Design a protein with these regions (language model features):
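Bacterial N-terminal signal peptides that target proteins for export
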Residues: 2-16, 25-26
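C-terminal segment of classical bacterial N-terminal signal peptides
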Residues: 21-29
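Short acidic, Pro/Gly- and aromatic-enriched capping/linker segments at domain boundaries
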Residues: 33-55, 64-68
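Buried hydrophobic positions in well-ordered alpha/beta secondary-structure cores of metabolic enzymes
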Residues: 57, 174, 234-236
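Short, isolated positions in well-ordered beta-strands
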Residues: 60-61, 230
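Feature captures the catalytic cores and cofactor-binding loops of soluble hydro-lyases/lyases
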Residues: 67, 72-232, 246-305
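Channel- or pocket-lining gating/hinge segments that regulate access to a cavity or pore
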Residues: 241-244
Length: 305
């Protein structure tokens, strides 16, 4: 596992006035952009990250851990309560339309925030984008920034009509570039063609009108996705229940907890199969004799009691 010191930790620029919009305060350097967290700011707002970072400053949860989550076929039902009990009750969002509902979505969040267009603000942000060499600020600006393993998480504030983030061609490009899927709190179109790619996508609805009357107000900033708060670099976990955004510093602990619970559940079923025990004897605190058996069962499955 490639865990390195946080190279941005001692370069933090003072806080931004509005985190959601990422407005730069007057005390920040001229490199700060109205719609984009710098790597230093990213480190400031993700201080618990134990891993190294991508070039844009997002936490780089190791590919090996993402593969572990995929290979475990981890489910939201196994993780939600763990996050809630750790003080993160607002990481789940359900009630989606889903392409490939039987396939898990796992990857690192690349967040994009839209708002209804306001001309004066949009003019300034377009100027900022041009100054950074991005050209015109639009959906393809963010799409071209995606890396392998990223999941585009797009806050289009639930807009479907005139809220189509991608059609079939851009969806295909995203799949080829990231190898994952997408989360669009907004619209999608050409669903039949996109479905053939096998890419899991969570979206709100379909409409033939292209994206308009919306402006990008944030790239890799904290965003709201329904009732959830997503941070750049969060691990996105999607299944048929919905979506979960897992803070990077909890990923290893969650993997361990899910493994332990699965082994404990397997042991419980094994005891029930004997027909010797009541449910109250297995769930809760086992007797010393049963606890000894459980401890050995866990060791046999590679888990330290």
């Amino acid at each position: 596992m490639n865990i390195q010191p946080n190279k941005w930790a001692k370069k933090v620029v003072p806080g931004i006035a509005c985190l959601v919009l990422a407005f730069a305060s007057q005390t920040q350097t001229v490199n700060a952009q109205v719609n984009h967290l710098t790597p230093e700011e990213m480190a400031h707002y993700t201080p618990n990250n134990p891993f190294d970072r991508l070039n844009d400053g997002r936490p780089r949860v190791p590919d090996a851990l993402l593969d572990t989550i995929r290979n475990m076929d981890m489910a939201i039902v196994e993780v939600y309560a763990l996050l809630r009990d750790k003080g993160f009750p607002n990481q789940f969002e359900g009630d989606w339309k889903v392409l490939q509902p039987g396939k898990r979505l796992v990857g690192r969040a690349f967040t994009v925030q839209f708002m209804p267009t306001r001309a004066d603000l949009n003019d300034v942000m377009q100027q900022d984008a041009a100054a950074k060499g991005w050209g015109r600020l639009r959906n393809q600006t963010t799409i071209d920034m995606l890396e392998s393993g990223d999941v585009a998480v797009v806050d289009l504030y639930g807009k479907v009509e005139e809220g189509t983030f991608v059609g079939d061609k851009l969806a295909y490009y995203i799949q080829q570039k990231t190898g994952t899927g997408m989360v669009i709190d907004g619209g999608l179109f050409f669903v039949e063609a996109i479905e053939k790619t096998g890419m899991p996508i969570y979206y709100r609805g379909t409409h033939p009108e292209s994206l308009r009357n919306s402006m990008i107000t944030g790239i890799n900033v904290p965003i709201r996705v329904g009732g959830a708060t997503a941070m750049p670099g969060d691990v996105v976990l999607g299944d048929q229940d919905g979506l979960l955004f897992i803070p990077p510093h909890l990923v290893e602990e969650i993997i361990d907890a899910v493994k332990r619970k699965r082994v404990r559940d397997a042991w419980s079923k094994k005891q029930f199969d004997t027909g010797k025990y009541k449910s109250s004897e297995i769930y809760g605190r086992p007797s010393p004799e049963l606890q000894k058996d459980l401890d050995q069962f866990m060791r046999d499955h590679g888990i330290t009691p």
